[in-house]
């Protein structure tokens, strides 16, 4: 039950895996396509799988440093074995003393225990300075104290065996594997062969192999003499000590071969010495390795920017360095919580940041939505390689093709030039000669131009210049405001008091009333005058008719 609990997936990791599975139900759209972005100076350099991990699995590896020789060959190997044994004791005694001092610092009194615990740590490091990592290592060492004691009770049987690899389970709280790199050599060379070897050859072969192993031990523990028990051993050091037998422990702890190659480069598999016994030459190391959950539908996409030509000068695109995509959602990924390898990201937590609609539109292929910053310096490399091809700003540097010979020119308005093996086989840039083997397919957009509205300033010097211009504009506006105030000051304030305003209003109303009355009177007089004119005209016409009638009569 105890060994099974050591490999159980922790609750936080299980919760993260369930979240990842839920996200995996979202149907994936096409991944971030860098081909339309290359001509705009935005290059997708690669993808990495995103994994979540926690360091929770532990197991012990007991390294048998002194091999058992066959009875008929003990006399021949006695001299090199005795010299090897003395050297081992000299090399590893500081390690054993350091482990013993830290483990003996544990007492039953809480406060006393803490003081002795810290004192043991400070006493075992150079200059009395204990780092957080060393305190953590010491804490782990004390927690493994009981397991180390149980291993020591079995030391005689472990030392007496001729097996190169076997499990040790009697009374141990976690998986333990006893391995012997030198015992493996002895078994292969002497125990499992019928070939007769003379004593001189046996002495020579054993001596050479023991010296080589001592060299590896010195490489592992030599730099750690100042604080030997508090420095973690890397996976490379563990393989040096245990040889290929290290795989047996890792496999027992549930680490598959498909994960092993990636985890080796991550540095997440570490070991801490927990015991050293000089009598039997046994070295115990507690191995810690992570529980890893793979987020199947999440990967990190890395972006790089190349200097591009604009009408405002040279600039670079404002895009995140790393983005992640799940379904149709693209967000910036914070990798400060992650450990990177060539193919994977191992993160203790996933932290993402939303992007503005403009950047999102830019990364999905709409290059007219991309924004650029005039922050590229004169020494910035104006080119980058991509899968055997080159993306270069041929306005900043001379793009000279050696095969076929010629100069590659960049058309007016183009941001960068896409150069592949179809346009040039051997390219020379700033004295660097590159042989091109890749090609840009039809999906790579060309002749992309950057508009003035897409270029902004973000550099300190550029911002200072813009602030200076803004300050000048503000100063001019203040001068105009002062002139306006001076003109307003010349106005007689006494004419603008309350009583004067009331008088002005009353006079204005009276004037309006008089004007209206005058207009009405004028209209009345005009109407009356027209009526009189009509009456006179009628009388005249009537008199004329009477005179005509009289004349006819």
From Swiss-Prot:
Swiss-Prot/TrEMBL keywords: Cleavage on pair of basic residues, Coiled coil, Disulfide bond, Fusion of virus membrane with host cell membrane, Fusion of virus membrane with host membrane, Glycoprotein, Host cell membrane, Host membrane, Lipoprotein, Membrane, Palmitate, Signal, Transmembrane, Transmembrane helix, Viral envelope protein, Viral penetration into host cytoplasm, Virion, Virus entry into host cell
Region named Fusion peptide: 117-141
Residues that span the membrane, as ranges: 501-521
Chief site of localization: virion
Its membrane topology: Single-pass type I membrane protein; Single-pass membrane protein
Transcription is among the record's keywords: no
Coiled coil: 142-170, 466-491
Pfam family, one: Fusion_gly
Keyword Glycoprotein recorded: yes
UniProt subcellular location: Virion membrane; Host cell membrane
SUPFAM superfamilies in the cross-refs: Head and neck region of the ectodomain of NDV fusion glycoprotein (SSF69922), Virus ectodomain (SSF58069)
Chain positions carrying an annotated carbohydrate: 85, 191-192, 366, 447, 471
Sites marked Cleavage: 116-117
InterPro entries cross-referenced by the UniProt entry: Fusion_F0_Paramyxovir
Protein family: Belongs to the paramyxoviruses fusion glycoprotein family.
Job of this protein: Class I viral fusion protein. Under the current model, the protein has at least 3 conformational states: pre-fusion native state, pre-hairpin intermediate state, and post-fusion hairpin state. During viral and plasma cell membrane fusion, the heptad repeat (HR) regions assume a trimer-of-hairpins structure, positioning the fusion peptide in close proximity to the C-terminal region of the ectodomain. The formation of this structure appears to drive apposition and subsequent fusion of viral and plasma cell membranes.
SUBUNIT field: Homotrimer of disulfide-linked F1-F2.
Name assigned to this protein: Fusion glycoprotein F0
Source organism of the structure: Newcastle disease virus (strain Miyadera/51)
Gene name of this polypeptide: F
